[in-house]
From Swiss-Prot:
Its main location: membrane. Pfam families: Glyco_tran_28_C (PF04101), Glyco_transf_28 (PF03033). One of its GO terms (biological process) is regulation of cell shape. This is UDP-N-acetylglucosamine--N-acetylmuramyl-(pentapeptide) pyrophosphoryl-undecaprenol N-acetylglucosamine transferase. It is an enzyme of class 2 (transferase). Belongs to the glycosyltransferase 28 family. MurG subfamily. Its EC number is 2.4.1.227. UDP-N-acetyl-alpha-D-glucosamine binds at residues 14-16, 168, 198, 292. Disulfide bonds: none annotated. PANTHER family: UDP-N-ACETYLGLUCOSAMINE--N-ACETYLMURAMYL-(PENTAPEPTIDE) PYROPHOSPHORYL-UNDECAPRENOL N-ACETYLGLUCOSAMINE TRANSFERASE, UDP-N-ACETYLGLUCOSAMINE--N-ACETYLMURAMYL-(PENTAPEPTIDE) PYROPHOSPHORYL-UNDECAPRENOL N-ACETYLGLUCOSAMINE TRANSFERASE 1. It catalyses: di-trans,octa-cis-undecaprenyl diphospho-N-acetyl-alpha-D-muramoyl-L-alanyl-D-glutamyl-meso-2,6-diaminopimeloyl-D-alanyl-D-alanine + UDP-N-acetyl-alpha-D-glucosamine = di-trans,octa-cis-undecaprenyl diphospho-[N-acetyl-alpha-D-glucosaminyl-(1->4)]-N-acetyl-alpha-D-muramoyl-L-alanyl-D-glutamyl-meso-2,6-diaminopimeloyl-D-alanyl-D-alanine + UDP + H(+). Coiled coil: none annotated.
Length: 357
């Protein structure tokens, strides 16, 4: 039944800036809300959101954070200004009750436009330290929600709330037998899932493939490589490659025993909620602002994960860290059981309701 309420989501650039929105959208659909989403023209958010029934996707111009000199950097302020004007028109036409932002540079013009339109907005920050897009958006927003309790010290006290990680309910409905069928694995060895982030990782992909002879003695391997990064020349029993997995991910997770992954916040909190021991290989500081290193070290400190820095990644270091992770897995799972993710979705929706009052 329609209730005439409308929520507008934004966020993109990587899957991590979309996942929380994907967790919240079904909640509001079940309650009869109208749902809009503002993203970029060609970002991964378009691929993830456009196929959803009952969600209207709108594209706007957006800038990009580059950690290197480029003439494109000179154009970005104008792209953000154009995106703000586009978002201003969309918000004026769609008249949302509230805007929920998951970050990424596409979100900056949307949150700014919401402020200009007098529409309240809420930002969700997944990482241990706030990203640049969210930092730029904070002055325009009503509330900022933190995934890590430690993040609160980096946020304005009058706007910040700790809510924890919002996990998609569907991830808890996966079936191991379906995951094994999808991947074509037998399940007679521990299943190792390798993920290099939504875009894949050349370094992780290369090291995994170089180590296959030894790794396949101990594991069956599901390797999510990234778009265009599958190596069709490798055909080995117990090893399967995918560019990307979307709807079947819950079943792949259910078939998984151990994970090798980057250390994006949303992904590692999903592994935590599913009690999957993980070896984290965070993006280096040269390739990022260092947020994944901080995320990974936080999980290591809490004994949820083992960490291998990318600069130290070799066949030998990978094999030794995996062996240690495998031995420690029962202890890690016991530690993971102490973490409760069930209250996070409720906390977020209650804050959304309060901000709208």
């Amino acid at each position: 039944m329609k209730n005439n309420k409308r929520i507008l989501f934004t966020g993109g650039g990587t899957a991590g800036h979309v996942i929380v929105n994907l967790a919240l959208i079904p909640y509001y659909q079940e309650r009869g809300w109208e749902i809009d989403y503002i993203g970029s023209y060609n970002g991964i958010e378009r691929d993830l959101i456009s196929p959803l029934d009952g969600v209207t996707y709108h594209s706007v111009s957006t800038g990009k954070l580059r950690r290197y000199m480029s003439k494109e950097n000179l154009k970005d302020p104008f792209k953000v200004l154009k995106g703000t004007m586009q978002a201003y028109r969309i918000i004026g036409k769609r008249k949302p009750s509230i805007v929920f932002s998951k970050g990424g540079f596409v979100s900056v013009p949307v949150v700014a436009a919401a402020k200009l339109r007098g529409v309240p907005s809420i930002i969700h920050e997944s990482d241990y330290t706030p990203g640049l897009a969210n930092k730029l958006s904070i002055p325009f927003t009503k509330r900022v929600l933190a995934t890590f309790p430690e993040t609160m010290k980096y946020l304005p006290e009058n706007k910040a709330s700790y809510v924890g990680a919002v996990i998609r309910d569907e991830l808890f409905t996966g079936k191991r037998d379906i995951g094994l069928k999808i991947s074509g694995l037998k399940g007679n060895k521990p299943v190792l899932l390798v993920m290099g982030g939504s875009g894949g990782s050349e370094k992780i992909n290369q090291t995994i493939r170089q180590s296959l002879t030894k790794l396949l003695d101990e594991f069956e391997i599901i390797h999510i490589c990234g778009k265009g990064k599958v190596d069709d020349s490798i055909q080995l029993d117990g090893y399967v490659q995918f560019e990307y997995i979307n709807h079947e991910l819950k079943d792949i997770f259910a078939a998984t025993d151990l994970v090798i992954s980057r250390a994006g916040s949303n992904a590692i909190f999903e592994f935590l909620a599913l009690r999957l021991p993980m070896l984290l290989i965070p993006l280096s500081k040269e390739a990022s602002r260092g947020d994944q290193i901080i995320n990974a070290n936080s999980f290591k400190k809490k004994n949820y994960a083992r960490v291998l820095q990318e600069e130290e990644l070799t066949e030998q270091s990978l094999e030794s860290h995996l062996l240690e992770l495998s031995k420690a897995a029962p202890i890690i799972r016991d530690e993971m059981k102490k973490y409760k993710s069930e209250q996070s979705l409720q906390s977020v929706t209650e804050i959304i309701d309060n901000v709208m009052k």
